[in-house]
Curated annotation (Swiss-Prot):
May be involved in a process influencing telomere capping. The keyword Zinc-finger does not apply. It comes from the Eukaryota. The keyword Cytoplasm applies. It comes from Debaryomyces hansenii (strain ATCC 36239 / CBS 767 / BCRC 21394 / JCM 1990 / NBRC 0083 / IGC 2968). It is found in: Cytoplasm. The lineage of its organism: Eukaryota, Fungi, Dikarya, Ascomycota, Saccharomycotina. Pfam families: TLD (PF07534). The gene is RTC5. This is Restriction of telomere capping protein 5. Belongs to the RTC5 family.
Amino acid sequence: MGQVLSKDNEDEANLNVTQKQFTKDKVLEYFNIQNHLQFRPVEIRAITSKLGIKNIKEKSDVTLNDLIYLLKIIKDEDIEGIDHNIKHVLNILSNSFTVIGNFPFLQSETTPKLSIESLMKSALFHTGRYKRLLTAEYDYLKLVFISLSGINKTYLEEKTSSSPSSSDDKEDTLYNLDVMGFSSEDEDSILSRKIKWNTFNVIQSFDDIDLDSIYVGAYDLLKLLTFFLILSSVPEMSHTQMQDHLSKSIARWSEFETYCLSIIRYINLDINVKNIKSTKISYEEFKRGISNGFPLFFSNAWMKIFKNGILSSISTTDVANSNNAPGSHGDANDNEVPKVHKKTPNFVESKLINDASISVISMCLKNMKSNLSITTQNLIKLYAGSESGFSIRSLESKIFKWQAPTLLLVSGKRVKNKTMKHNNRYIQFNEMYPSYFRSSESPKKDWQDDNDKMTYAVIINSPWKNSNKNNFGDEDTVILNLSPRFDFYKSVHNPVLNGKSIYFNNLGMGLGFGNSQPINKNTVKKFLPGDISLTIEANLEFAIFRHISSPNSNGASFFQKSKQNEISVQDFEDRFMISDLEVWGIGSTKELEEQRKQWAWEEKQAEARQSVNLRGLGEERAFLEMVGLVGNHSANGGSM
């Protein structure tokens, strides 16, 4: 659309940079012009048509009901009975978008209502288009933290009380902007293109906000992450199916929230059910936790809100009518319509696998940029101890014929002192498992609770086999901690170990991930646990996860230690009595790709309908009118 200078032109213009002064209102006007031009006409049309307006300046505010309609998260008829959790999240989103709407003057007092201008500016950042105006190095995560914080409440009140005249002075302040190839004859739309926004000191300093003085409420972040986890559980398929899937997942909010409580403990290990409403998360905790734990999940969720919702040409009417789309009946007249394929067998969830747990596991795989995809449509239950019995032979008979990746999950309650002292099978297991901690020190940490229920998962890419002598596996194996806290342990890249971190021993030594081959000779039976390892004894009754960060350990290192700030430097163990053990086969993603094509086709058809309306007006003029750059009697289109 010509909204940015080419590289050659920019290099030439850099030789002629002029510093000019502008008022705050003028700076905002120039930035807003450039913001609008980062969007396609069909995207602007998607917003205006859903809200029943001709241009984005026609409507002064966006209500929560408007936001629901734009996001397409529930059906129109369900708006009156909206879930209280969704209402909470909508308020968080609305407040966040309102703060970003002040950009670059983030310390400005915001209006109590969300505007379309703020929504558009939020779309600029959450879809990554800010890189066109700023740079790829701009700290997006810092902006998100500021937008989620209480900056417009506590922080601004303190600022105002300490310097009561500061806000008035700011309105009259002149700001220096670097302008490339400045000409006094430039119209606003042309001048806005010549400004070097990335050098503007207010943008570079985030308007001088003191990050140590603001925070994000842990409870609000829990609700937001739960919403994100629910969104990520919905695969791209026909929009009718997506909305139905989303509605069902929202109805099971508590299941997703339980996992998100584990996830938020990756940000702050001390958070629990009792203190979450009073806990505040600092910027350092926020940045470190999200950057190390789930950066793609966080940014992709924001992206999805705009891509599949606010900027999508699909309206709720389109969703309601999508069952009548040609693609649903295999219309032979349109060769681009996805073909209808037979449905995969109905997925039946288990004690350990449901939409919520799948969503967390998928989040991990995507963050690690794994080629594997896990959904309800490609998981096949191979073994469940509660159904087939907790027997190593039964486990072997169920999983060894599967020649594709598998997902193992094991769950149970922490072993208590009574069991340690009086359960003979545990005592025997403990004697075979070398102790790392001195008898005088407790291996249990303050953040571990006697009543914890632990769930670990392991992604295994190699086919299972008896490995009573040599380990098997590859460097794509990963151990996941799903509860009571979230964590992940990727394989170490080592040309000697070569990812051979797994054994399946049916001669009395069970299963091991991250261990060396156990010793099993004559009367000597001994496990050789690695620094980061999960050991399941042969009766499938007890398991131990070990995490040793100390450099003086003698154990093998098949897996990387935790990157969670507090955990990374700690030595600890999770010893638990197994209540559930399951293995699932990970099948083909062909069906997923077919459904994604159906989603893409519906989006394309909706955009085509919008484009017809735009061409009727003349696309360029229609776009300028929608963003409010020209009126009915103006022909100013210089920015194009």
